[in-house]
Amino acid sequence: MSEERETLREKLLSPRKNGYDRIKAEELQAMERYCGLYKTFLQQGKTERECARVAVEVAEKAGFKPYERGTALTAGDKIYRVNRDKSVMLAVIGRESLAQGAHIVAAHIDSPRLDLKPNPLYEDSELAFFKTHYYGGIRKYQWVTIPLELHGVVAKKDGTVVPVRLGEGDEAKFVITDLLPHLGGEQGKKPLNEAVPGESLNILLGSCPSGEEDEKDRVKMHIREKLFAKYGITEDDFTSAELEAVPAAQPTDIGLDASLIGAYGHDDRVCGYAGLRAILELTSPAKTAVCMLADKEEIGSMGVTGMQSAAFDTFMHDLCDGQGVPLRACYENSFCLSCDVTAAYDPNFPEVFEKRNAAFVNYGVGLCKYTGARGKSGASDASAETVAYVRRVLDEADVLWHISELGKVDAGGGGTVAMYMANRNIATLDAGVPVLSMHAPFETVAKLDCYMTYKGCKAIYEAE
């Protein structure tokens, strides 16, 4: 092939390349450092409350202050607001007026899990169990026979809130039992999504009785006594509790080359941490940078801590009010990176992916012009101009990225917070880390993609 022809091909075509063939050698150490911090974040935050608490802790160490309505702000000021201990909004005030808009990274810090029912504790056949109600789109069969922990809070009538963390470290774990294959013939004939009914996701708590032999429910009573001794909570207190069963597995490197990270909660804490870490490192951006760590995305972003709540609007209104800028005027000139994970192409399940438009591990940030299902139902569908803007910003910052869709057109679908940000008249584009085994109790991501997503968030914050 002639040199002229080869030059023309390079100009007109854009073949995808593995990120390790493109990343600068000096960035590999920075990538490992970043991923080490991310694994620590995952280890400390297995629920949305814990993630919010850790986010505030690291933000305060970076100089962020809690924002009180009416406080005068100047360029470079670093502030945050916590919404009901479950979501966090952080901002670094820009040099330009908010009339010129803000640059926002919105991610979520809730993940699929098993919540305890309001009246969860019972005994059957001298075994004690907790009843659960699954949260988010789980594949129920994946949650049986794996070690579990219990995290959350119990709110008492007197207003006391008791934090609960059971099963950590060397502590005894919990588990949901399953049928042995010798007796599982009928179960095996059922469709995968029916083989393990939601009502059978009961957590095994113990088997040791207490008290006298003629007492009723002695195993349940033994569990009650232990919970009261450790936390001072009674059976009635479960009525006002938020207790979540989460996988006990700790974040770990995956592969002989340690190029991947396996953990619970990559969706979407891998993007939430990217947005958080990037804003912590800002000094005085041109436009006000805002990081939104939302709750409730996995069940539709509803409720007071979800992205559909007015909490974000209230925070932004307070910032705009301090500059005499109408909120809607700020929104129409703002940009939001809806930072959420996407499905990584899995060669073990090629039938659900359209390979030319799939996200790949180690190819950098996966940009998604639209999500939704079937005919783009439930998608914000970013404009061509918005996608072009992000392309330019990422390229200028040497961020590796590739365009992607979730899967084949009629294979299924999914959604993010993008539509709720776009409904506010904020130009929005989805982008995030490609994930293998998304929504499983143990998901896998590539370190390179994690690092590039952090770089991408920082580039958006710093863009003119």
Segment roles from a protein language model:
Residues 1-464:
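N-terminal hydrophobic/helix-forming segments and targeting peptides
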